Amino acid sequence: MKQIINPLKGNNNKIPIWFMRQAGRYLPEYKKVRETTKNFLDFCYDVSKATEVTLQPIKRYGFDAAIIFSDILVLPHALGWEVDFKENIGPILKQFKSQEDFKYLQINPNYKLEKVYEIIKKVKKELPSPISLIGFAGSPWTVMSYMLEGKGKQDFKTSKKFIYENKILAEELLNFITEKTADHLINQAKSGADVLKLFDSWSGVLAEEEFTEFVIEPTKKIVLKVKEVFPKTPIIAFPKGAGLLYEKFIKEVPIDVLAVDQMVPLEKMKEWSDKVIVQGNLDPVVLLTNKEIIKEKTYKILQAMKGKNFIFNLGHGILPETPTENVEFLTEYVRLYEEKNSNSTF
């Protein structure tokens, strides 16, 4: 039985643990491999290197899941869109502005996604059998917003203005990305991914009406399309920053696991865990502190979610400056709590 899937089967004594960005810049062994390839996307498509860094945190920490090393922007890149990563800046994309851009997207695939599927197959062969392999994609709104902004981590005025003023074209682009995202996830499952995850990093910038149209509806379409082919493959969705709209999301989208950010109250996590497996939600900044603080914050989450359908994770990705020894301490602490499974403050 794959460890991370145990909560789906009603085994609530096991606390699966893995971390977003567990393969990344905080690991010295990752940096050593990363330095060998200048271009980040080339690194993502390098079967040998991407396999190696996917497995690094498993070898170091023994997490219950490996998440394939890739990026949410490989999808638009594979559709022929211009995507680049600048050091200390992040992703830079050709800005989507018109119907002509949409026509270009439809006729210019570059087939790079085949490399992602090769990586999954290779990792699957090398991954110890109890450990789950997670494939992933960016959710349509987040991928679309990167394309509309031309870069990330903005205030998203450009994206929101575009969808308000260009309803038909925005819907066409959304539907196109939704269809391609579902296909990408299906192909990852075909290649050996045990679990699939959708990252919607920028869902929290939308008001309720747009959240429904650009987050809930496309995610629902993707989940239903994937489940037609792989009905037993668990799907995790992470509509980061959704706030009160998390409740609407789990009511309307038939996901298996809801990943939540660190702003979600523990009482809400407990409540939602009766309807769906909940994943989260330690603040990544806690891992920059000391063992006592890590222990205190982690204990509160574990106690609140004791006996619930729960996967331990962070509220977002591991930060690059995170000390490796803190990740090790946190992982060991969760394991120890699991073993003792008591109310003591061990």
UniProtKB/Swiss-Prot annotation:
Q: Which reaction does it catalyse?
A: uroporphyrinogen III + 4 H(+) = coproporphyrinogen III + 4 CO2
Q: Name one GO cellular component term.
A: cytosol
Which residues are recorded as binding substrate? R21, Q22, A23, G24, R25, D71, Y146, S201, H316
One Pfam family from the record: URO-D
Matches recorded under InterPro entries: UROD/MetE-like_sf, Uroporphyrinogen_deCO2ase_HemE, Uroporphyrinogen_deCOase
Q: Which UniProt keywords apply?
A: Cytoplasm, Decarboxylase, Lyase, Porphyrin biosynthesis
Does the record's keyword annotation contain Lyase? yes
Q: Which HAMAP family match?
A: URO_D
Q: What is this protein called?
A: Uroporphyrinogen decarboxylase
Its gene?
Answer: hemE
